[in-house]
């Protein structure tokens, strides 16, 4: 039984190495996500490009974060979402 399992594994590995399993032709590598430049005014939250704090950001940056992500700054309260 072990011999059969070993032979099946080796045969499937050989097919993958030869490229017989993938019939779609050349597959290019997955591109990296674009680099997000940090905004001035504080640390950056994960994957969103908006500062964690509302302090020190411009009105246009605050409006952009609010419209794109629903993270809206309120006077004296910080982010709402």
From Swiss-Prot:
It comes from the Eukaryota. The modification Serine amide is found at residue 80. The modification Pyrrolidone carboxylic acid is found at residue 20. This is Penaeidin-3j. The keyword Disulfide bond applies. Residues 1-19 form the signal peptide. It is found in: Cytoplasmic granule. It comes from Penaeus vannamei (Whiteleg shrimp). Keywords: Amidation, Antibiotic, Antimicrobial, Chitin-binding, Disulfide bond, Fungicide, Pyrrolidone carboxylic acid, Signal. Antibacterial and antifungal activity. Presents chitin-binding activity. One of its GO terms (molecular function) is chitin binding.
